[in-house]
């Protein structure tokens, strides 16, 4: 919906009979005027896109970006890292993945994570990892950012709750929660 709202022409890539998106179907849609593709992984059927590396490679070879809908991120937390799968950008639904209330009494919170390829375009302020620590970036000097965000970043309480959830579970607990989510989805 957002892509259409800002003037992009949106086309669907059909899934195969197995419920998965195949690289050949993606390649048919790619061309010089394609800015990005969006894929939910695991998809709405609960299936992990087995050919995600080939899809990412095809998208990048066409000069486009690979955006991942993080709606089902809870199934891969601690198991796979989206950047390692070739994803350039992904939004994270805190209420689906990190146990925050939907909206929490105010605007929701859906952080967006970017690959190094897109980091230079992030509006300020944003956080980035530098030398093993988080750094707050508030200056657009040396970047290609389109400016400073003037809207809210989301409901701050949701970020605190999500962080508390992550810290209380730790890496092993988050991985176990993901494995349990997959088991439940396939039951």
Question: Predicted regions: what is each one?
Answer:
Residues 1-134:
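Conserved PLP-enzyme active-site core in the AAT-like
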Residues 83, 92-187:
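Active-site C-terminal subdomain of aminotransferase-like
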């Amino acid at each position: 919906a957002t892509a259409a709202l800002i003037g992009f022409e949106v086309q669907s890539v059909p899934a195969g009979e197995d419920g998965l998106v195949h690289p050949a179907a993606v390649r048919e849609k790619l061309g010089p005027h394609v800015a990005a593709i969006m894929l939910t992984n695991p998809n709405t059927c609960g299936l992990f896109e087995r050919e995600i590396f080939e899809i990412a490679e095809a998208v990048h070879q066409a000069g486009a970006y690979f955006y991942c809908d993080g709606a089902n991120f809870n199934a891969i937390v601690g198991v796979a890292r989206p950047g390692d799968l070739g994803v350039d950008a992904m939004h994270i639904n805190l209420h689906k993945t990190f146990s925050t209330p939907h909206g929490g009494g105010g605007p929701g919170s859906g952080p967006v994570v970017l690959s190094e390829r897109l980091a230079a375009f992030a509006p300020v302020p944003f956080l980035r990892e530098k030398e093993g620590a988080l750094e707050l970036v508030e200056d657009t000097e040396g970047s290609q950012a389109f400016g400073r965000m003037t809207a809210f970043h989301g409901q701050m309480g949701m970020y605190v709750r999500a962080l508390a959830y992550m810290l209380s579970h730790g890496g092993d607990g988050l991985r176990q929660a993901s494995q349990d989510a997959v088991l439940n989805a396939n039951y």
